Amino acid sequence: MKMTLIAILTCAAVLVLHTTAAEELEAESQLMEVGMPDTELEAVDEERLFECSVSCEIEKEGDKDCKKKKCKGGWKCKFNMCVKV
């Protein structure tokens, strides 16, 4: 009776570990397949550059010094525009 219980629990543990590992591999493979093409990344880059420079120009028109806008997502503001870090 004890041996049967130990065998069942061991099989259950192996099954759980195998299922978890399989799910992780599947998730990793989906992440590798689903990526933004370079053209989409370029469009995002251009959009952020435009937004930052326009924001800076609007601030200049108010007769105030242009304050550096905090750019997000790996960008920094330099020379009144967003630059990829």
UniProtKB/Swiss-Prot annotation:
Alphabetical UniProt keywords: Disulfide bond, Neurotoxin, Postsynaptic neurotoxin, Secreted, Signal, Toxin
Q: Which domain of life is it from?
A: Eukaryota
* Signal sequence coordinates: 1-22
Tissue specificity, in the record's words, reads: Expressed by the venom gland.
What does the UniProt record say this protein does?
Postsynaptic neurotoxin.
Family per record: Belongs to the neurotoxin 12 (Hwtx-2) family. 02 (Hwtx-2) subfamily.
**Primary location:** secreted
Q: Can you name the source organism?
A: Cyriopagopus hainanus (Chinese bird spider)
In Swiss-Prot or TrEMBL terms, this protein is called U4-theraphotoxin-Hhn1z
- The answer to whether UniProt assigns keyword Secreted to this entry is yes
Coiled-coil residue spans: none
Cysteines engaged in disulfide bonds, as pairs: 52-66, 56-77, 71-82
Propeptide residues, chain positions? 23-48
Extract the GO molecular function terms from the UniProt entry: toxin activity
> What would be one Gene Ontology cellular-component term for the protein?
host cell postsynaptic membrane
Q: Where in the cell is it found?
A: Secreted
